[in-house]
Amino acid sequence: MSGSDLEQMYQEVILEAAKNPHGKEHFAPDLASENASHAAETTVQASHEYCTPGESHQFNPTCGDEATIHAEVSDAEPYTIERLVWDGHGCSISQASLSVMVDLVEGKTVDEAMKLAETFHKLMESRGKGLNDEQAEESLEDGIVFLGVSQYPMRIKCALLGWEGMKDAVAKALAAKA
């Protein structure tokens, strides 16, 4: 795929995510948000103290991105991510990355989802060079458009916010089953 094709696809994915973000639901106000200014020094600290099982609150102080990710995992092995939703606000990169992530991991086994998260993280570490692994890049589907973001260290955190939240939310959902 040429650079201009990737740039056009990037624009389309970002615009689509802005208009119709996948997996976004407006959660009822929770204790994390309400207690952020009262019970803890930071929103992140308060959020982690009050999240429910299968839920993770992430905050990027550099950009102001904030998202709460909720994961529901099947009761039997191999554990599958049955439902993945999020609520939050932030820049178009964080919102688009969350939307693409939901499309990629919902319905996958936990192992498959963690492998995709690892692949996306490696893409962000590539500094615009890609993965040199066509199969890995193809596994990211629309997520490959974030290759351009990997050239900007301050924006990498925006793209990774939801992925880190997904990993944490899934881990909490699995821990609640133990």
Give, region by region, the residue ranges found by the protein language model.
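C-terminal binding/interaction regions
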Residues: 1-47, 108-178
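Alpha-helix initiation and capping sites
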Residues: 8, 12, 61-65, 91-95
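Structured beta-strand/loop patches that form or line metal/cofactor-binding pockets in enzymes
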Residues: 20-88
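Glycine-centered flexibility sites
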Residues: 64, 88-90, 107, 148
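Short, conserved glycine- and acidic-residue-centered signature motifs
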Residues: 87-90, 94, 155
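Catalytic-loop motifs flanking and including active-site residues across diverse enzymes
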Residues: 93-98, 158-161
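Alpha-helical support elements that line or immediately flank enzyme active sites
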Residues: 97-109
